[in-house]
Amino acid sequence: MVPQTANMNEVIDKIDMSLDDIIKLNKEQQNKATFNGGARTNSFQWFQNKWGSRQATDNGIQGRKNGMFGVKTGLALRKMNSWKGVSPLNRPPLSLRNSEGQWSPFRRRTNLSRRLGFVPSLKRNYFHSSYAQASTFRRGLRTNQQRDQRQATYFQKRGLKVQATMDMEQLEEFPELKRAHPWRTSMNSGGILTVSIDNPTAALLPSTRLPRPTLPFLLKKEGSEPKIPKGVPLDFDINSVVKQTGITLNERFKILKEQRLSQSMSKGSRFVTVG
């Protein structure tokens, strides 16, 4: 880096000075610059960029600046164009780079469909079609059916019978109701709710006095004898396993000892067993 000719004399003077003197001289020049209202002794011109950070121009630096290596295309090229004229040391942080002012043209392009109010045809025509009306009608009909079913089961567990009926005029007005059972649904307050309670003290009809026939699987077959399970009869004879004698264990072991002694004496063994 080569300094300008205007500052050449100052550089030559500083060569002959000691390090302490150079530091003192630089401090004095800085104090004078701040006292004079921002006058700079060096050749750099300072200004404040749009992100609020200070940036120095390279007027005092002579020589050729090297360009960017490689070929940038696409999004990388757009980023480079947005940073054009900004030093790499003074570029804004990522939080400011992604602000509204940085990518406003690209965001405007992506949000174009939202601003113009483009909606898919299926979603746009859904509420204006007969399918939406029929589906919402079926949904309300289904909730009413479920409510009536829950009410019927509640009464049935407590010994009550529930039956909800509808007028025929209502069925003609809503043809969708013909598919469902009319006794389950009641769409308005004109429905009739019939509740029947069992009364044992009331007079029974002749048809109800007859006893109910027993179910066929509950009837027992007459004359059925218990079956003998098939198998081989097991006769266990304890005498075949062991002979019952009146000899005690001590007598039995004594006999065995005597047998061993007699066998050893007959063979002429050198070992003598002491009983």
From Swiss-Prot:
Name the principal localization, coarsely classed.
Answer: nucleus
Q: Report motif location: UAP56-binding motif.
A: 11-29
Q: Name one GO biological process term.
A: mRNA export from nucleus
Q: Any idea where this protein resides?
A: Nucleus, Nucleoplasm; Nucleus speckle
Any single GO molecular-function term of the entry would be: mRNA binding
Determine if Lipoprotein is one of this entry's keywords: no
Query: Does the keyword field hold Heme?
Result: no
Q: Which UniProt keywords apply?
A: mRNA transport, Nucleus, RNA-binding, Transport
Its cellular-component GO annotations read: nuclear speck; nucleoplasm
Q: What is this protein for, i.e. what is its function?
A: Required for mRNA export from the nucleus to the cytoplasm. Acts as an adapter that uses the ddx39b/uap56-nfx1 pathway to ensure efficient mRNA export and delivering to the nuclear pore.
Q: Which family does it belong to?
A: Belongs to the UIF family.
Q: What is this protein called?
A: UAP56-interacting factor
